[in-house]
């Protein structure tokens, strides 16, 4: 059995329309509710990718006994103590100013492959107009990039737990995805 949840604000389900409804803590709470309360998963293999790593790695840290293995692709768990790449900081700033927020075009610019019109339409489908893009638009700003970030202490605590995690953990990064 594989569970591949869309993060709140990204999939086709109902979603809050105000950016203030989206916080790192709320995203983590929504995901933990799905995994542990609704699906009642007890022991599972975890694959996290991109934004999902910000949340999934916290789940590993907080519930290590539930995790059998971890695969983490193109992600991390920043604390705001290390300098983020200038390109990410520029994207973080730009994402908050973009209006409209062209989800499909953003995905296309972030890939090395040409995406077909059908694939771009699939990326755009959950966001028929700007009111549906609050979650996608705010997510870059939720990434801790400064020591003052509200999630800095929580991510540092998660790192302390992750350093003790002794189960299989595979990290994947690509320069061509």
Regions picked out by a protein language model, each given a short descriptive name:
Residues 2, 6-9, 31, 46-50, ...:
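Generic structural signal for small/hydrophobic residues in well-ordered secondary structure
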Residues 3-48:
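Active-site loop/oxyanion-hole signature of alpha/beta-hydrolase fold enzymes
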Residues 9-10, 21, 52-53, 76-78, ...:
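Short, solvent-exposed loop/turn segments at secondary-structure junctions
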Residues 26-34, 58, 105, 122, ...:
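Alpha-helical elements of Rossmann-like donor-binding domains used by nucleotide-donor carbohydrate transfer enzymes
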Residues 38-83:
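Conserved hydrolase catalytic core segment
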Residues 71-105:
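A catalytic-pocket lid/entrance helix-loop region that shapes and gates access to the active site
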Residues 103-115, 122-128, 141-148:
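Helix-loop "lid/cap" segments that line or gate small-molecule binding pockets
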Residues 114, 132-177:
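Conserved serine/cysteine hydrolase catalytic core
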């Amino acid at each position: 059995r594989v569970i591949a949840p869309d993060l709140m604000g990204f999939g086709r389900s109902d979603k809050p329309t105000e950016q203030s409804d989206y916080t790192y803590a709320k995203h983590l709470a929504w995901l933990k509710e799905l995994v542990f309360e609704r699906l009642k998963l007890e022991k599972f293999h975890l694959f996290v990718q991109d934004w999902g790593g910000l949340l999934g790695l916290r789940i590993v840290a907080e519930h290590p006994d539930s995790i059998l293995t971890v695969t983490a692709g193109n992600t991390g768990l920043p604390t705001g103590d290390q300098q983020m790449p200038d390109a990410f900081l520029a994207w973080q700033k730009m994402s908050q100013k973009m209006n409209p927020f062209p989800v499909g075009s953003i995905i296309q610019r972030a890939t090395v492959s040409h995406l077909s019109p059908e694939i771009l339409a699939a990326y755009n489908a959950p966001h028929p107009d700007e009111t549906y893009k609050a979650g996608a638009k705010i997510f870059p700003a939720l990434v801790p990039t400064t020591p003052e970030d509200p999630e800095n202490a929580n991510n540092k605590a998660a790192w302390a737990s992750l350093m003790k995690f002794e189960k299989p953990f595979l990290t994947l990064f690509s320069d061509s995805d």
